[in-house]
From Swiss-Prot:
Source organism (scientific name): Acidianus ambivalens (Desulfurolobus ambivalens)
Any one GO cellular component localisation term in the record: S-layer
Keyword Signal: yes
Membrane-spanning ranges: 487-507
Function: S-layer small protein. May anchor the complex to the cell membrane.
Superkingdom classification of source: Archaea
Family listed: Belongs to the Sulfolobales SlaB family.
Protein name from the UniProt record: S-layer protein B
High-level lineage: Archaea, Thermoproteota, Thermoprotei, Sulfolobales, Sulfolobaceae
Main localization (coarse): secreted
Keyword set, alphabetical order: Cell membrane, Cell wall, Coiled coil, Membrane, S-layer, Secreted, Signal, Transmembrane, Transmembrane helix
Membrane topology recorded in Swiss-Prot or TrEMBL: Single-pass membrane protein
Signal peptide as annotated in the record: 1-24
Length: 511
């Protein structure tokens, strides 16, 4: 093994000499370590540990190899350089794990207390020749992950890349791909053990893709991850959540192992929770999509259907029941349009509705206060009435007590009068009976008289007829008498008849 290593080193040296001579360079110094862009783990912030390997076929044997280091934020050495060794007989120097203490460095004239991650420049000098090598000092507790996102073989810019800890699902970092479809993320890393990450990428209009990445212990170079996604023609994008007039923007929060986008929202018990959703196909608003949510409440499967509100937007409303709070709902929202289907998840945290409860209690308190005020008025009115009635009762009692004897005398007097009236009534009743008997006798007598008069009237009527006959005979005999004489006779007869009738009527009335 050592033999092969020596051959490899010798070959590298000869290649370096060949390149140096062929280029006609003025220096033959070749630096093998550190190499440009090398990542160096900062295990101890108090010292910077490097591997130094150089070769210079022109420099004399035993030439001193010096190292000068500068870093970010104007970090530099306090001296012109540090000798790390001498070239051996093969014109080489190889030093492993050479430690540069922090006491050799300053920043802006002040000695630093610890190294910080960043880009450092290592300048190696041998016999008047030097080479500057850029390196990256990284924290051993961090690892850089380079995520390249492609769609149809073309880099996809604007994709959101997220890295999660597989063990606990914690979101570690999020970044967006650049124009080359690349996102650089530096995440926590435990260099003493194997680390597992879940890398996801998503962009509106594209499928969410993810990949689990395993990084072994003591790994210091960047980890490259390639993700390939496909366009989605039909997409549902929640715009905002609304509950009790409060609007909450909808922000995606992808969870490891879930291909659907996940959104987190909160609402209050006993209210109507709404999700405003954009439905697009190839970026254009869609009307006629069917969007519904399914969820479990107290073990019962429930569902709600969204209504179209215009411009490709839909309102999905859910009535949150009164239950033991707080409680959580997982809303699985699925939309279909033609042959396309899209699904996302909303995790809803339902909290107690203290506002409505306070309003309800305030309303009840107001009603009770109003009723109490009304009762106070009624009680005051009753008290006044009772006081007045008590006064009247007292006055009436005094009046009655003072007039009992008077009323007793009046009652006795009334009883005497009633007895007198009863006696008088008895007398009047007896007299009335007597009068009635007398009147009955008189009526009977008058009736007899009327009958007699009727007979007389009949007789008189007969006589009148006879008289009329006589008069007619006389009229024939006495034609020379004037009309006036005849009229007087007729009037006399009529007056006699009227007198007789009047007498009859008087008797009937008396009867």
């Amino acid at each position: 093994m050592v033999k092969y290593m020596n051959l490899i080193v010798l070959g590298m040296l000869m290649f370096g000499v060949f390149v140096t001579l062929s280029l006609g360079s003025s220096t033959a110094l070749t630096v093998y370590s550190p190499f440009p862009g090398e990542h160096v783990a900062l295990i101890n912030p108090k010292e910077l540990i490097l591997n130094i390997s150089v070769y210079d076929p022109i420099a004399p044997v035993n030439s001193t190899v010096g190292v000068t280091i500068s870093g970010p934020y104007d970090i530099k050495m306090t001296s012109a350089g540090v000798p790390v060794g001498e070239l051996n007989s093969s014109h080489m120097l190889t030093v492993t794990d050479y430690a540069f203490p922090v006491t050799l460095f300053e920043a802006n004239g002040t000695q630093i207390s610890a190294f910080i991650p960043g880009q450092y420049n290592v300048t190696i000098s041998v016999a008047g020749c030097s080479e500057t090598i850029p390196i990256y000092v990284i924290s051993p507790n961090e690892i850089e992950i380079l995520v390249c996102v492609y769609s149809n073989g073309v880099p996809l810019p604007g994709a959101t890349v997220s890295i999660y800890n597989v063990t606990n699902g914690e979101l570690l970092l999020t970044n967006t791909t650049n124009s080359q479809g690349l996102a650089e993320l530096t995440v926590p890393y435990v260099y003493t053990m194997t680390n597992e990450y879940n890398v996801t990428a998503v962009k509106p209009g594209y499928q969410l893709v993810y990949k689990e990445v395993t990084v072994p212990a003591d790994h210091i170079t960047p980890v490259t991850v390639k993700l390939t996604t496909k366009p989605i023609t039909f997409v549902l994008t929640p715009v905002y959540f609304q509950d009790m007039g409060v609007i909450e923007p909808a922000e995606p929060a992808q969870l490891p192992g879930t291909p659907e986008p996940v959104y987190v929202a909160s609402a209050y018990m006993g209210t109507t929770f709404s999700i405003i959703i954009n439905a697009t196909e190839s970026g254009m608003p869609v009307q006629g999509a069917t969007i519904s949510a399914s969820y479990l409440i107290s073990g019962k499967q429930m569902s709600s259907t969204a209504t179209y509100i215009g411009n490709g937007q839909y309102n999905l409303s859910i009535v949150l029941p009164n239950s033991t709070v707080p409680y959580d709902l997982e809303l699985v929202i699925t939309g279909t349009y033609q042959t396309n289907t899209y699904t996302f998840i909303t995790l809803l945290s339902v909290q107690p509705n203290f506002y409505c409860e306070i309003q309800r209690l305030q309303s009840e308190v107001s009603v009770l206060e109003s009723e109490v005020d009304q009762l106070k008025v009624e009680i005051q009115s009753l008290n006044e009435t009772l006081t007045l009635q008590a006064s009247e009762i007292a006055s009436l009692k005094t009046y009655l007590e003072g007039n009992v004897s008077y009323f007793s005398m009046q009652i006795s007097s009334l009883e005497s009068e009633i007895k007198y009236l009863n006696s008088t009534l008895m007398t009047l009743s007896s007299e009335l009976t007597t009068v009635n008997s007398t009147l009955t006798s008189e009526v009977n007598s008058l009736t007899s008289e009327v009958n007699s008069l009727s007979t007389q009237v009949s007789t008189l009527s007969t006589e009148v007829n006879n008289l009329n006959t006589t008069i007619n005979n006389d009229n024939q005999k006495i034609s020379s008498l004037t009309t006036l004489v005849y009229g007087g006779i007729i009037l006399g007869v009529i007056a006699l008849i009227i007198a007789i009738v009047a007498v009859v009527l008087v008797f009937r009335k008396v009867a």
